[in-house]
Swiss-Prot record:
It catalyses: L-methionine(out) + ATP + H2O = L-methionine(in) + ADP + phosphate + H(+); D-methionine(out) + ATP + H2O = D-methionine(in) + ADP + phosphate + H(+). It comes from Streptococcus pyogenes serotype M18 (strain MGAS8232). This is Methionine import ATP-binding protein MetN. Pfam families: ABC_tran, NIL. GO terms for molecular function: ABC-type D-methionine transporter activity; ATP binding; ATP hydrolysis activity. InterPro entries: AAA+_ATPase, ABC_transporter-like_ATP-bd, ABC_transporter-like_CS, ACT-like_dom_sf, MetN_ABC, MetN_ABC_transporter-like, NIL_domain, P-loop_NTPase. It is an enzyme of class 7 (translocase). The gene is metN. Residues 8-250 form the ABC transporter domain.
Length: 354
């Protein structure tokens, strides 16, 4: 089992502005293992960006303890390292942002080389390092181009190469794909996954989009008003969300909310017969492989009219959603619901026939 490379224990961050006290982060505990791609998701004002500054050691917490790669860096708001040791710890963390922050008058390779200006490498070693980094992010042929000659995705690749220049163990992505189109976003996420595998890089994804979490992360924390309200594996959170905000994020990411809007306009749903109901079925793992709807028809004479279906692969495990109209005798539908529950399917009744 991988050990935690980032440990935030009971972190409070409070700001004082004149007569106001702002509790930006309240009693947050997060442990991120080596090699994780860990998502922190929430709307604006949730405390995500403040938490980023704690993780990359730019913000001292008011209370709580921070341990990075085995070293306690802050405890009860007090720094535990020398200034030099803290600077070195900060170099162990790379950052990429929504805005690429490239220097317009420098080429791609010069932008990457700028991150090595304090390195002990020789000039030749730095040149080789820059070439290797641009190859790693798939941009070696654009080494001599200026930012104005690059697309948004290419600029972000330069920013990633620059963030990796000092061989960090941790990479923080703070809304790094928010300014990109969907196709380019997928390409950048695929690159980050590749870097995670190749380098053993621990990646922290700060985002307001659960779709990003679904596509790339293995664990996720959901924040609201400075509080961590839910945390777990992506599989557990998507298949069994507990909090209303988490459920809202997930229905948006999976397209269920949009599907329901359209389904509710269909005549079959507007005029459900008395012996029918509209239900959402959620299932994960082996239950996705079972012909359950055929089974409940054979056993209970309950028909299932599928109005929507979707299967995602999360952390190598299939997770599915279906919206169906179940029709049959009332006692048979109850028996079918029980059988579905026993097979590991979560059944939510959305509407009953009149």
């Amino acid at each position: 089992m991988n050990e935690a490379i980032i440990q935030l224990d009971h972190i409070d961050i409070t700001f004082r502005q004149k007569k106001r006290v702002i509790e930006a982060v309240k009693d947050v505990t997060v442990h991120i293992n080596q090699g994780d791609i860990y998502g922190i998701v929430g709307y604006s004002g949730a405390g995500k960006s403040t938490l980023v500054r704690v993780i990359n050691l730019l913000q001292a917490p008011t209370n709580g303890k921070i341990t990075v790669d085995g070293d306690v860096t802050f405890d009860q708001g007090k720094i535990q390292l020398s200034a030099n040791a803290l600077r070195q710890k900060r170099r162990d963390t790379g950052m990429i942002f929504q805005h690429f922050n490239l220097m317009a008058q420098k080429t791609a390779k010069e932008n990457v080389a700028f991150a090595l200006r304090h390195s002990s490498l020789s000039k030749t070693e730095k040149e080789h390092k820059v070439i290797e980094l641009l190859e790693l992010v798939g941009l070696s042929e654009r080494a001599d181009n200026y930012p104005a000659q690059l697309s948004g995705g290419q600029k972000q690749r330069v920013a990633i190469a620059r963030a990796l220049a000092n061989d960090p163990k941790i990479l923080i992505s703070d809304e790094a794909t928010s300014a990109l189109d969907p196709k380019t976003t997928k390409q950048i996420l695929a690159l980050l996954q590749e870097l995670n595998r190749k380098l053993g890089l621990t990646i922290v994804m700060i985002t307001h989009e659960m779709q990003i979490v679904k596509d790339i992360c293995n664990r996720v924390a959901v924040m609201q008003n400075g509080v961590l309200i839910e945390e777990g594996s992506v599989l557990d959170i998507f298949s069994n969300p507990k909090e209303a905000l988490t459920q809202k994020f997930i229905t948006t990411a999976t397209g269920i909310d949009e599907a329901l809007e359209k389904i509710n306009q269909q005549d079959i749903v507007k005029h459900l017969p008395a012996n029918a109901l509209l239900a959402q079925l959620k299932y994960a793992g082996t239950s996705t492989d079972e012909p359950l709807l055929n089974s409940i028809y054979r056993q209970f004479e309950v028909t299932a009219n599928i109005l929507y279906g979707n299967i995602e692969i999360l952390d190598h495990i299939p997770v599915g959603d279906m919206i169906v109209v179940l029709e049959g005798q009332a006692e048979n539908i109850l028996a079918a619901e029980k059988a579905l529950h026993e097979a590991g399917v979560d059944v939510s009744i959305l509407k009953r026939g009149a």
